[in-house]
From Swiss-Prot:
It holds the Pfam family FMN_bind. GO terms for cellular component: plasma membrane. GO terms for molecular function: electron transfer activity; FMN binding. This is Ion-translocating oxidoreductase complex subunit G. InterPro entries: FMN-bd, Ion_transpt_RnfG/RsxG. The keyword Mitochondrion does not apply. Keywords: Cell inner membrane, Cell membrane, Electron transport, Flavoprotein, FMN, Membrane, Phosphoprotein, Translocase, Transmembrane, Transmembrane helix, Transport. It is a single-pass membrane protein. The modification FMN phosphoryl threonine is found at T176.
Length: 212
């Protein structure tokens, strides 16, 4: 009887061990696949906001970490990606956060050239209202392309407001909070770059990039 119980216990233990091992293997494979897809999507977005013809490096491989709660909307460190040509920094893609969206944080990435001109803007994540605030997604609206070619002269640059507030950027029909927060976030991130451009464009890669 005792031998039978011991045998059954060993079998159950072995079965549990095998199941745990299989789950760990599946999780590892799934994680690697997810990370690979994230890198592919990141590379796609980066090449949308920084034209291929102005740089000769792979943007995801020159990542630096930036942090400034006053200009980047969060106390957390954020990645930025340096575009180089012949080893010289020519543009940057900066991740930033609009903390005051209608439904919370809006994560944004902005491409800027050395002159501080906006090359492109994309929304990385948000929880804005479908049909209203989600016009910040390129697949829903071309609104984010309105930033292309813009520069910021100072924090008081009056152009950098939605038209309802006296600026030059359109708001959405039935939604003002989302575009207002978005415009301010892009403006502040651009000002951050203008203030630190020499240091940023010459910075060596300093954050880990998972290329699995």
């Amino acid at each position: 009887m005792k031998k039978s119980m011991l045998k059954n216990g060993l079998l159950l233990g072995l079965f549990a061990l095998l199941c745990t091992g299989l789950v760990a293997i599946v999780n590892q494979l799934t994680y690697a696949k997810i990370k690979q897809q994230e890198q592919i999507e990141l590379s796609r977005v980066l090449h949308q906001i920084i034209p291929d013809e102005i740089h000769d490096n792979e943007l995801t491989e020159h990542c630096i970490t930036i942090q400034d709660s006053d200009f980047l909307g969060t106390t957390q460190p954020l990645p930025a990606y340096i575009a180089t040509r012949n080893g010289d920094g020519v543009a940057i893609a900066i991740e930033t956060v609009a903390p005051d969206g209608y439904n919370g944080n809006i994560k944004i990435i902005i491409g800027l050239n050395k002159a501080g001109e906006v090359l492109g803007v994309r929304t990385l994540s948000h929880q804005e209202t479908p049909g209203l605030g989600d016009k910040i997604e390129l697949r829903k609206s071309d609104w984010v392309t309105k930033f292309n070619g813009l520069t910021v002269s100072s924090e008081k640059d009056k152009r950098w407001h939605v038209k309802k507030d006296g600026g030059q950027i359109d708001q959405f029909t039935g939604a003002t909070i989302t575009p207002r927060a978005y415009v301010n976030a892009v403006k502040l991130a651009t000002l951050y770059f203008n203030e630190h451009k020499q240091k940023l464009l010459s910075a060596p890669a300093s954050c880990e990039v998972d290329n699995e």
